[in-house]
Amino acid sequence: MLTPGARLIAGGQSLGPMLNFRLARPERLVAIGALSELRQVQETPQALLLGAGLTHAAIADGRTPDLGERWLGRIADNIAYRAVRNRGTLGGSLAHADPAADWLVTLTALGGFVLTWRARGSGRAIPLEAFVAGALRNTLEDGEIVQAVRLPRPSPTARWGYFKACRKPGEFAHAMAAFFDDPERGVRRAAIGAANGPPVVLIGDRARPEAVEEALALSGLDAVGRRMQAVALDRAIAQAGGL
């Protein structure tokens, strides 16, 4: 779909700063922000599908369906600043694959899938924990773009919490964690972000603060950083009502 050296741009809130600092130097940009096909929303009893072109502000303002007690809206509320939320998109944030991106860690904890589109062949449904190959590296193939995100619908008794530690409002987090517990579906997941790579996922009984430092042993974080991540998960669990 793209010629060599081209990059897609939607809201420009992730790629724009990289262009400013010459960290990305594509030969041309292909603007996709106006494509209505990327802003579609679908609801079923089993799942919620959100188009990749939806802005953070649309989700924060309740212009899209939500999960639980405004779980997604509260996540979007705390992304950067209003100017960024007005233009930044769900799909762009995920494709950028910043380890400290809010959507990446939270939607991983919720068991989300990235749905892709390809000009040749069928698209894929990629579990979010398999979507990121490393810091600022995703697993999209040539000619493949993020089309939407699919989130399993939680049961009425499901619980959720999210916490991130920032020195000041609006900046990227230094430690972040999300916790999701759905006993009716037999699902308990935690995701740790801002850990120098893909979100670290803890499942079942391992989704507890005591498991964080061991899980981050190879992350490159120092002892203080690993401890901050354990505290972030502890606070996310507290938001959800405890274990």
Protein language model features and the residues they cover:
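C-terminal structural segment of proteins
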Residues: 1-243
